[in-house]
Amino acid sequence: MARSVWKGPFVDGYLLKKAEKVREGGRNEVIKMWSRRSTILPQFVGLTFGVYNGNKHVPVSVSEEMVGHKFGEFAPTRTYYGHGADKKAKRK
């Protein structure tokens, strides 16, 4: 179920402050963050965030198409190694 419109998008407060500091400074550094649940806002476009996936910070460069999505969508938490091959077929 989608979030109610009257509530507005959720963004952690510290994230807004960090993004504002980087914009004011004019430098393009990676903003480390642990808030995968935060929504990407239009003012984040052009910035690079290091989204934590439980192991390391995955760099995510925010573009126009990402606005409205959550940061966690762009940093996968699980590694897919594929399904196991049939052992009988391997031996032949």
UniProtKB/Swiss-Prot annotation:
GO terms for biological process: ribosomal small subunit assembly; translation. Keywords: Ribonucleoprotein, Ribosomal protein, RNA-binding, rRNA-binding. It comes from the Bacteria. One of its GO terms (cellular component) is cytoplasm. InterPro entries: Ribosomal_uS19, Ribosomal_uS19_bac-type, Ribosomal_uS19_CS, Ribosomal_uS19_SF. Pfam families: Ribosomal_S19 (PF00203). Belongs to the universal ribosomal protein uS19 family. This is Small ribosomal subunit protein uS19. It comes from Brucella canis (strain ATCC 23365 / NCTC 10854 / RM-666). The gene is rpsS.
